[in-house]
Swiss-Prot record:
This is Suppressor of activated egl-4 protein 2. Ubiquitously expressed. Interacts with phosphorylated egl-4. May interact with itself. May be a component of a histone deacetylase complex containing saeg-2, saeg-1 and hda-2. The keyword DNA repair does not apply. The keyword Nucleus applies. Residues 138-168 are annotated as: Disordered. As a likely component of a histone deacetylase complex, together with saeg-1 and hda-2, functions downstream of the cAMP-dependent kinase egl-4 to regulate the expression of genes required for egg-laying and foraging. PANTHER family: DEOXYNUCLEOTIDYLTRANSFERASE TERMINAL-INTERACTING PROTEIN 1 (PTHR23399:SF2). Keywords: DNA-binding, Nucleus. The lineage of its organism: Eukaryota, Metazoa, Ecdysozoa, Nematoda, Chromadorea. GO terms for cellular component: nucleus. Residues 158-170 bind DNA. It comes from Caenorhabditis elegans. Pfam families: DNTTIP1_dimer, TdIF1_2nd.
Length: 305
């Protein structure tokens, strides 16, 4: 439609111009030519143009799938490797993601061309002449040097440390709509100065499972991932033992539906109150998730479960 309009404008300008070489005519010709170059003239090009338009959204969804499987399917293996002294940093995970994407491409790729038959002599051995034998030796030497180089690069990659912290967003872990009880637990209005908290490690110990399995079993449970400043504050207040890895805070009252009733009092005994600055950060984090969840509520609840 855009090309049709431009052609009509060009036709009018050509009719009003004596020699058809005015600046406006030349400008319209240039615009029409540029628009035609951007147009797809076959099905693959047209679909690829649509792909480029939606590529950012597609890539974001793929990234969410990778994160979900990292936090659920792969997390026990990652934790086990780290306990055994292995380094599982961002470069290792990125390599794993690339392998996953490469494997996912195979069903959509063309079948490989058939290999030519291998020539053999009468004794069943490969029939190669001396020149081919010499070339194979050279390729073998080059392969050896490449292998050594690859090992050195791999060693350099393993020596790198550090992985950027990523926010924990429970709404990404499952595709099914959350229940009303799950939504209400993220309401920031239920969190005040009298709210008692407990670490996820303590709850997991009572339930006899690691925290990763706890979050896999209850992917939408309310939790707050402490950053380094939060952990330092809790450590200075003797509320947290300094340890490597992430620290999650849960609302102690939420444990009533998780642990057996006989152990709930033990949970309350090790729970604690937190200071206002940290409480404000927790409420802010809860509010962002609650805004995404509350669309599933039929009506605004007046009390909290």
């Amino acid at each position: 439609m855009r090309i049709v309009i431009l052609d009509e404008l060009l036709s009018r300008e050509m009719d009003g111009s004596n020699d058809g070489s005015s600046a406006r005519v030349n400008s319209l010709k240039h615009v029409i030519k540029r628009n035609k170059m951007d147009m797809a003239d076959d099905a693959p090009s047209s679909l690829d143009l649509m792909r480029r338009i939606f590529q950012a959204e597609i890539s974001r969804e793929i990234h969410q799938i990778m994160e979900r499987h990292t936090r659920t399917t792969l997390l026990p293996a990652i934790e086990n490797l780290r306990k055994n002294g292995h380094v599982v940093d961002e470069s290792v995970l990125n390599g794993l993601y690339c392998n996953i994407l490469e494997a996912a491409k195979k069903p959509y790729q063309k079948d490989p061309e058939p290999m030519p038959p291998i020539c053999t002599n009468g004794n069943g051995f490969l029939d190669i002449n001396s020149q081919e034998h010499e070339n194979n030796l050279k390729r073998g030497y080059e392969s050896d040097s490449s292998d050594v180089s690859g090992v050195s690069h791999c060693s350099d990659a393993k020596r790198r440390r550090g992985r950027p912290r990523k926010d924990e967003e429970a709404y990404r872990l499952e595709m099914t709509p959350p229940t009303m009880n799950e939504v209400i637990r993220w309401n920031p209005d239920r969190i005040d100065v009298n709210t008692r908290f407990i670490t996820a490690t303590k709850i997991a110990q009572v339930m006899g499972m690691p925290p990763s399995i706890l979050f896999n079993k209850y992917p939408r449970m309310f939790r707050y991932s402490c950053d380094e400043d939060d952990k330092n504050i809790l450590h200075e207040q003797n509320l947290l033992i300094r340890a490597p890895g992430r620290c999650y805070l849960l609302v102690a009252e939420d444990a009533r539906q998780l642990v057996p009733s006989t152990y709930f009092q033990d949970v309350l005994n090790v729970s604690f109150l937190i200071s206002e600055p940290l409480l404000s950060k927790i409420r802010q984090k809860a509010a962002s998730t609650y805004e995404k969840y509350k669309v599933f509520l039929p009506t605004q609840p007046n009390n909290y479960l």
